[in-house]
Amino acid sequence: MVEKSVAFVEGVSKELYLKTGVRFVIDMTDFEKNPIALATKNERQNYQEGFLKQLKPPFVVFFFYHDAQKIELVANPKDLLDTDKIFFEKIAPLLPTNAKEYTPQRISAMLINGYSVAVDALAQKYRVNITQNFNAPKGVTFVKVVIYILLLTLLGAFLGLYFFKKS
C-alpha cells in the first residue's frame, strides 16, 4: 500500500478500537517487507489460522495475498460483519483483471475502499462515529456520478459516430 493509505488505516483502526473495542488489521503478504510465498489455498489457510490465533476477539482481518492474487476478509465473531456482502459489493468490482493492473495505487484503492466500508458497517453496528474515516455516502455518490458521466460520454461518442457515418 502507498504510505498515505497506511497512515489512514492506522489512524482509523486506532479510533475504531478505542470507540468499539474491535481490532481491524490488514495483512499483506508476498511483498519485500513481508516475503511469505503462499501459493496454495492450504498454505494460505494455515497462515491465516496462525495469524488469527494471535488476536483476541472481536476483530476483523483483511488478508491480501499479492502473488496469489487472493483476498480474504475474516471477522470474529462471524456475525460481527457481513464479510461476503462487503467483498462482493465493494471489493470485487475493483479487483484488477490482469497482472499489469496490480500496481500499488490500484491495490491501495481496492483495500481502502473495502476497509472504509467495513469500518462504516462496524461504526453503525456499535452506534459510533469514526471521524477519520471517509464519508461513505458521499464517496458512493461521487463514484456513481463519475460512472454516469463516462457512460453518457461513451454513448454520445458512439451515437455521434453512428449518425455521422450514415450522412
Regions found by a protein language model. Name each.
Residues 1-141:
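Folded, non-transmembrane soluble domains that reside on the lumenal/extracytoplasmic side of membranes
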Residues 131-167:
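C-terminal single-pass membrane-anchor helix
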